[in-house]
Design a protein with these regions (language model features):
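Helix-to-loop junction immediately C-terminal to a conserved catalytic motif
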Residues: 77
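Catalytic Walker B motif of ABC-type/P-loop ATPase nucleotide-binding domains
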Residues: 184-188
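Conserved ABC ATPase "signature" region
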Residues: 32, 137-155
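Conserved ABC transporter NBD signature motif
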Residues: 85-96, 101
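The feature captures the beta-strand-to-loop junction immediately N-terminal to the Walker
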Residues: 62-64
Length: 263
């Protein structure tokens, strides 16, 4: 269970580059005048006060570029800490219990290469497996199992640098799955995958027992979730069934680009 209690995220307007702050999305920022808790005369609000209780197994977050959706995702494992309010994951506060939350919440970035630190897929997943405390005699089997689940078993010993962008994203996903987190958060994990692999990964996510939260531009993927949030200019403007939220998102986009097609 994930709870956001009156959570907001802001950066000082005097900062030379707001985007330098983790999760900041200046394209969506709105300036709010008046002193903050820290005495700053003004600040750029990235995410306006948000209260949510996420209990569904699968939650999708959709929105235009710069809407604040990635900031919302990064709040869930403490990559971004709220300026105000509280984020709790299974009862643990991301500020007070940050290390425990990060062990509990696996995160797959859109830039998967940043998560890959070992020379080969086998070694990269093995590193994650070791961190879980799996007995030495069972580690090799677990590595094979995880690589097989994402379709990379046949590439276990090739150089990571030889993998395609899509394969690197699959490897990053494998590394996170190997840690056996209770919650999985994905920030556009299928961006570089072709239709075949996107279908494969989507089916894999549907079989997982963990709670899954994913930021996506793919409305077909969003429709497979149990609940969909629409984020716009740092606010959750729709929250409900996949069909209702996707319809609200299409209508929102239509008012801006004059079409119901995905931008």
């Amino acid at each position: 269970m994930i709870e956001l209690d009156a959570v907001s995220v802001a950066v000082p307007a005097s900062a030379s580059t707001p985007a330098a702050s983790p999760g900041a999305e200046p394209a969506s920022a709105r300036r709010r005048w008046g002193r903050t808790d820290h005495g700053t005369p003004e600040e750029i609000t990235i995410l306006h006060p948000t209260t949510l209780s996420l209990t569904e197994r699968s939650v999708a977050v959709i929105g235009a570029n710069g809407s604040g959706k990635s900031t919302l995702a990064r709040l869930l494992n403490g990559l971004v800490l709220p300026t105000r309010g509280y984020v709790r994951v299974h009862g643990l506060d991301t500020h007070d219990d940050g290390r425990a939350v990060r062990r509990m919440v696996g995160f797959v970035f859109s830039d998967a290469e940043a998560q890959l630190v070992m020379p080969t897929p086998r070694e990269d997943v093995a590193l994650s497996v070791r961190r879980t405390g799996v007995e030495r005699s069972l580690r090799a089997e677990r590595v094979e199992e995880v690589l097989g689940s994402v379709g990379l078993a046949h590439l276990a010993d090739v150089s990571v640098h030889a993998l395609s962008g899509g394969q690197k994203q699959l490897l990053a996903l494998a590394g996170v799955l190997a840690t056996e987190p209770r919650v999985l958060v994905f920030d556009e994990p299928t961006t570089l995958l072709d239709l075949r692999w996107r279908t494969h990964v989507t089916a894999l996510l549907g079989r997982l027992e963990q709670q899954v939260v994913h930021v996506t531009h793919d409305l077909d993927t969003a429709l497979l979730a149990d609940r969909v949030l629409v984020v716009d200019h740092g606010r959750v403007v729709a929250d409900g069934t996949p069909e209702a939220s996707v319809a609200a998102y299409r209508e929102l986009m239509a008012t801006r680009v004059g079409t119901t097609d995905e931008p």
